[in-house]
């Protein structure tokens, strides 16, 4: 099998389809100059074979293989190799063996995507790789590819390295691998033996001793456990006996406590009767006091009216301040609008150049039209003169000659005026020279004044800069008035909030409990008052009345963790002696008589015909409250299973439900309550204090107050900074005024000084001269115009007299043209005028709007001044009213002193009521203590009962042994039972157990037996490993023998090929491979002889001879592992020219079934090739010329084929460099 054709398309330097071939089955050569593209053919072969290392084909990425990397419009590159497989037997495997031709294509598309085709069908890269590797053509380990560097490498190889080449060819590497693996396995066996010995002597034997000891300890541990269990049983039996005895005692004490509770309740009722009697007496005193306090009521009424008036005036002031702020905002808006209009006017001013151009163009048109009209008037005048020789509308009347006379008179007048102006100007110039001389005398004095002016101007400029800086920094102080207004509004709001807060605070303080936490308690032990811990959700605010009626006085309860904390807090704060009633609620006392959950509520809703998710008609108290999730039990306790309903009917249906499980106490949103006992309450609830709402309102107002306080602080700071800056501005403005006045005075001095007077006269003369020059310029223009008119008239008279008819026709034609031209220009002038008028109209509109806004600004300022005046009047009125209020309060104080007798009686009655209340509180406290005692007893009863039940349930043996409890002569005799002695015995045993348990091994018995088994197993394994080691040593010895035999046989075969190849390449010379020191393990070396005269060293040879020797060895190695194709890249570079001519014969004789593709630069090499491809580079394109030589008859071949020389020229683009 051999390469028949290579087709390149868009690959490297081959932009179009290029067919290289046909190739000869044996010797093919490629030649060409450097840069001609010859190496690209070898790169193409490597590319198709699937080379991985792109550096070997001189690119970094696949895109670079496309012609000019795709920049010339070619985005795809492909290489196709056509193999001829007609020779039999084929080296290929199935299914390729019977195919005559095989085509492999590889394509690369810009972007790096590539694909393979095998016989025009898509193929995987692995299929292609397997195809070539089946032919021993592995491009990524290419033995068939010989580069120039490989020859140099072989020349410099040492004997051991040369031996390595033979080993590689012989396949003894496999022996080496097996031998190495066997040695590694033997080392592992040695290690295993060492490990087994180590385990036996260092682990197993010591472990056996250790486990024996652990086994004894474990038996002791089990015995101790049995003893402990016996003592614990006695102790449990004692606990059970004591708990059962405690149950009986608690039941007796509870009966006694209940009797005492009834006595205390009776005493409290009697105290309530006495309190009621004193309250009636107190009301009587109040009535008498009210009768005597009518004047006081009048004064109080007047006081309230004054306070109301002050409040009203403050509201008015606040409204006026708001109005003032509104007007100030309006003023700022007007200012912004004025600035906006000014900006627009400024924009028109910036576009003034364009407007001026339009205006100039318009003026030029006007002038042009006027000139043309004058010319038309002239022509018409002339025409009139020609037609009628009468008068016309011009200032000059009469015939042509009369007009000529008038023009000449006017010309004479103009010339006279010119002479007068010239003489006057000359006189004035002389006068100016005289005045300048006179001015020099006063220059010194003037310069001193001028210096003063410069100094003042500098000072003025500095002041202006400072003012500009301040105005920019503080935005022209526009915020000042706004901030003042904001401050007043905030102050008034805070005053109002403070009054509202005080009212709310008084309400809260009426129930607030002030307390201190003892040092032996934590802050978390006191949770706080109920009203602070819960909150009604905003969406359920309509339930507020119902919630307050349910909770009532419980809102003021102080919640603590337990009874002990309650007791400490009560005693520490001395609540019993205080005037305010304080109720402490320990968490453990919150006994819920009936717990209500969501499922119960849903059942109620279903029962009354509502949707189970309807939360508006039947309301679950947990849904409407905000609280800490840890306090859910408290909420259950507070509401005590009461539900809130939207109407009375729903309440009745739920409360009076025959099914008691679905019957609950209910209350309507209006406050009508229905109890399960059958009672109902309701009525007017107008005076109910909705305390939770007030507390939330208080918190909200307090937050508002703090927010306003922070805002006020911020506004005050800003205002202070602005006022400070404004003060600075006033000072600078005064300084600026002074500097401006100084400058005006200096300018007046400069004007009134002698220098200034003379200078003024000089300027007046200069102005007069300039004026005269302007008039003179007009006179010169008039003179020129009159001269031209006179000349023209004289010419017209002459022409008219010569040709009157023709003159008339010409004048008519000229007049017609002038009229048309004037009409055209007037149309253009009209358009220009409209454009200018639009711009001027827009400017005028903006100016009018600005003027209107300016007037509005003045009006707004006046309104603000009026409002400020009103605010001032209101504040004066407030101050006067406050003074009146103070006088009134003094009168009330004087009047109050006259009520001392009533007060004494009242104090006596109040004292009695307070004493009774105190006594009642003490009784209530005793009752509460008794209740707590009852709760403790009930708790103890429950604890004892629970203990009995728990012990009975968890220790089933109690049922059998209970009759023996506290019986003599049994293990459960409690007469001499001492808990501490039992505990000590148990403790002693547990201590011993703890010591044993540290190192106890509960599996010691099983482990001891297992370790004995392991010991026997390891001894058996040790014997097995020793036997395996012996077998491995025998295998290694056998491998060494086989390797030596195989290597020697390969050496002899390669030596034979080496001698034959070298003799073919170099006539009259012999070569051989010699074993170093008679031992193949020492390596081999190459020997050479000329005419049977063997050289001792290769150093005597030329470089070409040494290269030929290395080439022969490489080819001999290749022949051992024959492949269908060999590629040699410039291997003749190191060869002499006369050594290359026999390479063709060598290929034919030594490699009759292999194809050679050789890249060469030497004629001696390629001139003997069967087919020669010559590469050239013409006009940026590579060309390929094929030369097929006559095949001469070889000694090893009989086939003779006549091949005509043919030349195929393929134009290509610029190639890669070789």
Curated annotation (Swiss-Prot):
Keywords assigned: ATP-binding, Cell cycle, Cell division, Coiled coil, DNA condensation, Merozoite, Mitosis, Nucleotide-binding, Nucleus
GO biological process assignments: cell division; mitotic chromosome condensation; mitotic sister chromatid segregation
GO molecular function, one term: ATP binding
Coiled-coil portions: 209-517, 693-949, 978-1045
Short name of one Pfam family: SMC_N
Compartment(s) where it occurs, according to its Swiss-Prot or TrEMBL record: Nucleus
Domain SMC hinge, residue spans: 525-654
Assigned GO CC terms: chromatin; condensed chromosome; condensin complex; nucleus
Main location: nucleus
Annotated residues for binding of ATP: 32-39
Transmembrane segments: none
SS bond list: none
Uses in biotechnology: Possible candidate for an effective malaria vaccine as determined by epitope response in sera.
Function: May play a role in the conversion of interphase chromatin into condensed chromosomes.
Notes concerning its domains: The SMC hinge domain, which separates the large intramolecular coiled coil regions, allows the heterodimerization with smc4 forming a V-shaped heterodimer.
UniProt protein name: Structural maintenance of chromosomes protein 2
Classification lineage: Eukaryota, Sar, Alveolata, Apicomplexa, Aconoidasida
């Amino acid at each position: 099998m051999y390469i028949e054709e290579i087709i390149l398309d868009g690959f490297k330097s081959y932009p179009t389809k290029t067919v290289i071939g046909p190739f000869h089955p044996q010797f093919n050569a490629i030649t060409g100059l450097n840069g001609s593209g010859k190496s690209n053919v070898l790169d193409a072969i490597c590319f198709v074979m699937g080379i991985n290392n792109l550096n070997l084909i001189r690119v970094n990425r696949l895109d670079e293989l496309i012609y000019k990397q795709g920049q010339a419009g070619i985005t795809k590159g492909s290489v196709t190799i056509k193999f001829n497989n007609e020779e039999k037997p084929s080296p290929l495997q199935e299914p390729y063996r019977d195919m005559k031709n095989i085509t492999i294509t590889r394509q690369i598309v810009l972007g790096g995507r590539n694909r393979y085709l095998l016989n025009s069908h898509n193929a995987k890269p692995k299929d292609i790789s397997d195809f070539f590797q089946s032919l021993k053509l592995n491009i990524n380990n290419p033995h068939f590819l010989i580069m120039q560097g490989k020859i140099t490498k072989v020349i410099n190889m040492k004997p051991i390295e040369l031996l390595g080449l033979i080993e590689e060819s012989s396949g003894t590497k496999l022996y080496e691998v097996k031998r190495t693996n066997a040695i590694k396995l033997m080392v592992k066996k040695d290690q295993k033996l060492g490990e087994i010995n180590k385990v036996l002597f260092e682990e197993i034997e010591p472990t056996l001793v250790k486990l024996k000891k652990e086994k004894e300890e474990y038996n002791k541990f089990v015995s101790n456990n049995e003893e402990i269990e016996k003592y614990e049983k006695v102790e449990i039996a004692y606990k059970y006996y004591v708990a059962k005895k405690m149950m009986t005692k608690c039941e007796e004490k509870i009966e006694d406590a209940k009797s005492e509770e009834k006595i205390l309740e009776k005493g409290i009722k009697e105290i309530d009767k006495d309190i009621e009697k004193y309250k009636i007496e107190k009301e009587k005193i109040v009535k008498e006091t009210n009768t005597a306090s009518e004047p006081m009521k009048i004064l109080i009424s007047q006081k309230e009216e004054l306070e109301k008036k002050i409040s009203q005036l403050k509201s008015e002031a606040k409204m006026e301040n708001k109005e003032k702020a509104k007007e100030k905002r309006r003023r700022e808006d007007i200012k912004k609008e004025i600035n906006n209009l000014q900006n627009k006017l400024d924009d028109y001013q910036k576009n003034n150049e364009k407007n001026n151009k339009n205006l100039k163009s318009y003026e030029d048109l006007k002038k042009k039209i006027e000139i043309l009209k004058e010319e038309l008037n002239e022509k018409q005048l002339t025409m009139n003169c020609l037609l009628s020789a009468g008068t016309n509308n011009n200032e000059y009347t009469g015939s042509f000659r009369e007009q000529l006379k008038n023009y000449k008179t006017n010309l004479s007048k103009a010339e006279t005026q010119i002479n007068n102006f010239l003489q006057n100007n000359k006189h004035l110039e002389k006068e100016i020279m005289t005045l300048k001389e006179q001015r020099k005398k006063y220059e010194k004095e003037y310069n001193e004044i001028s210096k003063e002016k410069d100094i003042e101007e500098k000072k003025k400029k500095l002041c202006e800069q400072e003012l500009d800086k301040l105005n920019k920094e503080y935005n022209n102080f526009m915020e000042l008035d706004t901030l003042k207004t904001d401050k007043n509004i905030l102050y008034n709001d805070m005053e109002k909030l403070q009054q509202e807060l005080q009212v709310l605070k008084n309400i809260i303080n009426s129930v607030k409990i002030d307390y201190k936490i003892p040092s032996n308690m934590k802050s978390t032990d006191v949770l706080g008052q109920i009203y602070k811990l819960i909150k009604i959700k905003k969406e359920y605010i309509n339930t507020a009345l119902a919630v307050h009626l349910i909770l009532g006085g419980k809102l003021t309860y102080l919640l603590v963790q337990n009874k002990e904390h309650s007791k400490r807090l009560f005693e520490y704060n001395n609540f019993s002696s205080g005037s305010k009633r304080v109720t402490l609620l320990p968490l453990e006392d919150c006994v819920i008589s009936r717990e209500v959950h969501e499922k119960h509520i849903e059942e109620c809703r279903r029962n009354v015909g509502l949707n189970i998710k309807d939360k508006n008609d039947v309301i679950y108290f947990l849904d409407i409250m905000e609280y800490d999730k840890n306090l859910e039990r408290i909420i259950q306790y507070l509401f005590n299973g009461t539900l809130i309903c939207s109407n009375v009917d729903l309440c009745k249906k739920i409360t009076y439900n025959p099914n008691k499980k679905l019957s609950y106490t209910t209350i309507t949103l209006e406050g009508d309550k229905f109890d399960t006992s059958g009672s109902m309450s309701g009525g007017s609830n107008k005076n109910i204090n909705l305390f939770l709402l007030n507390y939330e309102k208080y918190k909200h107002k307090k937050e508002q107050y703090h927010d306003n306080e922070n805002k006020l602080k911020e506004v005050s700071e800003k205002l202070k900074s602005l006022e400070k800056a404004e003060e600075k501005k006033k000072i600078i403005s005064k300084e600026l005024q002074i500097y401006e006045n100084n400058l005006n005075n200096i300018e007046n001095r400069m004007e009134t000084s002698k220098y200034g007077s003379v200078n003024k006269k000089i300027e007046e003369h200069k102005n007069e001269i300039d004026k005269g020059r302007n008039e003179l310029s007009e006179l010169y223009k008039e003179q020129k115009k009159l001269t031209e008119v006179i000349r023209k008239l004289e010419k017209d008279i002459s022409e008219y007299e010569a040709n009157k008819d023709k003159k008339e026709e010409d004048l008519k034609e000229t007049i017609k043209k002038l009229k048309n031209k004037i009409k055209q220009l007037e149309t253009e002038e009209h358009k220009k005028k409209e454009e200018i008028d639009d711009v001027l109209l827009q400017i005028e509109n903006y100016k009018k709007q600005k003027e209107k806004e300016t007037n509005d600004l003045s009006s707004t300022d006046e309104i603000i001044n009026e409002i400020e005046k009103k605010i001032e009047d209101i504040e004066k009125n407030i101050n006067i009213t406050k003074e009146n209020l103070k006088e009134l309060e003094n009168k009330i104080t004087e009047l109050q002193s006259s009520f001392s007798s009533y007060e004494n009686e009242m104090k006596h009655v109040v004292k009695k009521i307070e004493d009774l209340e105190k006594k009642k509180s003490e009784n209530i406290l005793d009752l509460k203590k008794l209740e707590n005692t009852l709760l403790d007893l009930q708790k103890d009863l429950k604890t004892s009962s629970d203990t009995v039940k728990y012990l009975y349930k968890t220790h089933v043996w109690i049922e059998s042994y209970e009759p023996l409890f506290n019986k003599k002569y049994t293990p459960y005799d409690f007469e001499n039972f001492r808990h501490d002695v039992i505990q000590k015995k148990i403790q002693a045993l547990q201590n011993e157990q703890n010591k044993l348990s540290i190192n106890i091994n509960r599996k010691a018995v099983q482990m001891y037996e297992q370790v004995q088994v392991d010991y026997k197993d390891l001894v058996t394994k040790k014997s097995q490993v020793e036997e395996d080691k012996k077998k491995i040593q025998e295998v290694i010895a056998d491998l060494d023998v086989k390797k030596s035999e195989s290597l020697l046989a390969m050496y002899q075969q390669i030596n034979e090929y080496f001698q034959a190849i070298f003799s073919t390449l170099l006539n009259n010379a012999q070569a051989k491979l010699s074993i170093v020191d008679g031992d193949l393990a020492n390596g081999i070396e190459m020997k050479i002889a000329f005419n049977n005269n063997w050289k001792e060293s290769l150093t005597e040879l030329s470089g070409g001879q040494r290269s030929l020797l290395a080439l022969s060895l490489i080819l001999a190695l290749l022949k051992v592992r024959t492949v269908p194709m060999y590629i040699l890249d410039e291997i003749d570079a190191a060869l002499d020219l006369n050594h290359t001519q026999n390479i063709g014969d060598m290929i034919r004789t030594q490699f009759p079934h292999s194809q050679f593709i050789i890249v060469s630069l030497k004629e001696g090499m390629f001139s003997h090739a069967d087919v020669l491809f010559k590469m050239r580079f013409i006009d940026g394109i590579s060309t390929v010329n094929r030369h097929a030589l006559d095949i001469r008859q070889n000694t090893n071949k009989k086939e003779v084929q006549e091949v005509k020389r043919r030349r195929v020229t393929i134009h290509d683009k610029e190639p890669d460099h070789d």
